[in-house]
Amino acid sequence: MKRKDTLKDYRGKSIDQLQEAKIELLQQLFSLRMQKGTGQLKKNHLFKSAKRDIARINTIISEKNK
């Protein structure tokens, strides 16, 4: 159910808000990479979820631009 809720949330936002959310996710992904490099990261599944959320946002942005 979480995916459907996030999709509804993303679709309700404007393009500018989606761009901001994408930037936040990219920053989160960068911080996860740094934690992995230093050996502090124990939850590797967060990479996959962050990348998928970024892809979802990119898809919605392209849909709204049409």
Curated annotation (Swiss-Prot):
Keywords, comma-separated and alphabetical: Ribonucleoprotein, Ribosomal protein
GO BP terms in the entry: translation
Superkingdom assignment: Bacteria
A GO-annotated cellular component: cytosolic large ribosomal subunit
Record flagged with keyword Ribonucleoprotein: yes
Signal sequence region: none
Keyword Aminoacyl-tRNA synthetase applies: no
One of the record's GO molecular function terms: structural constituent of ribosome
Pfam families: Ribosomal_L29
Similarity comment: Belongs to the universal ribosomal protein uL29 family.
HAMAP family the record matches: Ribosomal_uL29
Official protein name in the record: Large ribosomal subunit protein uL29
Gene assigned in the entry: rpmC
